[in-house]
Design a protein with these regions (language model features):
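The Walker A/P-loop phosphate-binding site
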Residues: 5-96, 115, 119
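Conserved nucleotide-binding/hydrolysis micro-motifs of P-loop NTPases
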Residues: 55-57, 83-87, 95-98, 109-113, ...
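Substrate-engagement module of ASCE P-loop NTPases
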Residues: 147-168, 172
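Structural recognition of the conserved hydrophobic beta-strand(s) that form the central parallel beta-sheet
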Residues: 79-81, 104-106, 125-128, 165-172
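Proline-aspartate-enriched helix->loop->beta-strand connector
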Residues: 116-128
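Conserved RecA-like P-loop NTPase ATPase core
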Residues: 35-38, 51, 89, 129, ...
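Flexible beta-alpha connector loops of hexameric P-loop NTPases
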Residues: 24-26, 52, 78, 100-108, ...
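Long, basic/Gly/Ser/Thr-rich N-terminal segments
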Residues: 1-3
Length: 177
């Protein structure tokens, strides 16, 4: 005999797909043609995109180029770095011609602090580099653990929807997957 638990009332109701109102104004072009092509037109407000790959392959450089290009169109963004100092990222941004007043930068790994920064800056795009460095102290496990990565990523999905912001998570491919 299998027991099930009820957890409150459903938060939504089924609807015919044609009756669903598109709250997102569609994708927002990044300014990088090839990235926009791969993403089907650009980043979608309220969504999360994962940029993954092996360490050293250029993920951080790519997302910084993306922010520089978006800033050229007046798009406010927030780059959250859990790996490099703000000075290191500024140096790379300078090299990539991505220095712009529309790009905000913070070195942070604590999930609640990142939420606060997103609310303060009110960006259209948030980059989190990398998801493996994030930490929610309430979970009690180490940063980079499967539990931390899963729960922090899920929390950022909720933040993306709540603030209607496009979130890009940078993730390293590891031997563990």
């Amino acid at each position: 005999v299998r027991e099930t638990a009820t957890v409150g009332t459903p938060t939504s109701r089924p609807a015919r797909i044609g009756d669903v109102v598109d709250d997102n104004a569609g994708s927002r072009a990044t300014g990088l043609a090839e990235v926009d092509r791969v993403l089907g037109g650009g980043l979608v407000p309220g969504s999360v995109t994962l940029v993954g790959g092996e360490p050293g392959i250029g993920k951080s450089t790519l997302v910084l180029q993306l922010l520089g290009a978006a800033a050229g169109s007046g798009v406010r963004s927030l780059y959250v770095s859990g790996e490099e100092s703000a000075a290191q990222i500024r140096t790379r941004a300078e090299r990539l011609a991505a220095l712009d007043d529309h790009v905000w930068l913070v070195s942070e790994t604590v999930l609640d602090h990142i939420r606060t920064h997103i609310a303060e800056v009110d960006p259209a795009v948030v980059i989190v580099d990398s998801v493996q460095t994030l930490h929610d102290p309430a979970l009690g496990s180490a940063p980079g653990s499967v539990t931390q990565v899963r729960e922090c990523a899920n929390a950022l999905v909720a933040v993306a929807k709540e603030h209607n912001v496009a979130v890009v998570l940078v993730g390293h491919v590891t031997k563990e997957g």
